[in-house]
C-alpha cells in the first residue's frame, strides 16, 4: 500500500474571494509601502553595484576563507567578499581566492594604503600567499551594471507576459504581470527596509522568484481555462474558486517542500549565500500568495471572454431562420 503525504486535502471548498477586499488592500498597502521605503532608505548595494577593488590571491596552501575574513576584520573595511576560485586548469598546489572590497562613499576605489594593509594581513595568515593582480571598478561601471540588472528584470516581465497572452488571453497576461510586479516590488521593499545586501546574486534570486511565481500562476490559469470550457454556465467567480481549490494541494506541497530546503540553507548556509536564499524564501512565500489572491482577482475584475454567454452560433442560426 503506497503512502501519500497530504498537506492539504485533495478536495477543499475554500472561498478565496471572501476576503478579496482585505487581500487587495493588504497587497496595495505592501506595494505602496515598498515604494516609500525604497525611496527613503534605498537599497544596500553590494560590491557589484557600488564599485570597489578586487585582489586576487594565490597560495600553495588551501584557502581558508574564515581565517582570511578574521584577519581583515580589524581593518574595518566595510563590505568585504572573499570567495575561493576553482578552475580545472589550476595545478595541485595552486589555490586561488578573490578578496573584493567595496569602495567607500564618494571614492572611486580602495586606496593603495588599504590594499597594502590587506596584503600584509593576509600574509600573516599564509606567508606563501602572493597577489597576482589588483583590479578596481569605478562607480560608472557599477551604475551601468545596475541598469543592466533593471533591464534583465523588465525583459523577463515582458517576455512572461507575452507568453501568457499567447497561451491564454490578454486578461490573464495582465493578471500575471500585476502578480509578478507585486512579488518583485515587495521583495525589494523588504531588502530596503532591513538594509539587506543587494548584489548580483539577489538579481538572480529575483529572476528565480519570477519563474517560480509564474509557474504557480500558470497552473491555476490552466485549470481555470479547463473549467471555463467544462462549466460553461457557472459564474466566473465560482469557476475561479473551484480552480484554485483543485490546484491548492499541488501549490502547498510544491511550495512547502521547497521552503524546507531553503530554510535549512538559510540557517546553515552561512553569510555568503544568506541574501540569495532569503530573497528566494521570501519570494516563494509572497509568490504563492499572489498566485492565489492577486492574479485571479485581476482576471476577475477585467473579465474573461465567455463564448457561452454570447452564443454567436445561435444568433446566426436565428438570422437565417428569420430571413425571407
State where each predicted segment sits:
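A structural signal for conserved, well-ordered secondary-structure elements
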Residues: 1-324
